[in-house]
Regions:
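Nucleotide-sugar-dependent glycosyltransferase catalytic core
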Residues: 155-157
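Radical SAM/AdoMet-radical enzyme domain recognition
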Residues: 3-26, 34-151
Length: 157
């Protein structure tokens, strides 16, 4: 969605919504591919809304993370759908798991940022949940959301 359209949508809800009653979440596709994500965040904050995002960690560097926090981001969720083999298969990217784990590692170093990890359980990832739990604990994760996924596409395998 182009920035101007995003701002129009934001303004349309601002006219009848108390910003203190709403928390804006930016999510999928992948928010961090937006070159104007920090601008979006600043505009959300300027209108009085707290905001956060759900991302896969692929494009989330330390510098980008700090820029997003300076833009007003208060929370972030990182998707991690299995251990390396399953997560990379599910995300169709050979570095997806490593990027997600690195993002989680960076995020745990920022105590003022609320964060969690989201796992969509599939047949392939179900046996990995105990090992994932241990991994997440070792990374300092305190909140882990585990959910099922509608079994279509790769999720059905």
């Amino acid at each position: 969605m182009p920035l101007q359209d995003f701002l129009k949508v934001l303004d349309s809800i601002t006219t009848h919504t108390n910003p203190h009653d709403v928390f804006v979440i930016i999510s999928g596709g992948e928010p961090t591919v937006r070159e104007d994500l920090e601008t979006c965040g600043k505009e959300i904050s300027r209108r009085g809304y707290p905001w956060g995002m759900v991302c896969n960690g692929l494009c989330l560097t330390r510098e980008r993370l700090h820029n997003l926090i300076r833009s007003g981001m208060r929370s972030i969720s990182i998707s991690l759908d299995g251990l390396k083999d399953v997560h990379n298969w599910m995300r169709r990217h050979p570095e997806s798991f490593d990027c997600a784990v690195n993002a989680i590692w960076e995020i745990t170093a920022i105590p003022e940022l609320t964060f969690d990890v989201i796992t969509c359980v599939t047949r392939r990832s179900l046996p990995q949940l105990p090992a994932m739990k241990e991994l997440l604990i070792s990374l300092g994760v305190k909140r882990w959301r585990v959910s099922t996924i509608f079994p279509v596409g790769r999720a059905a395998e």
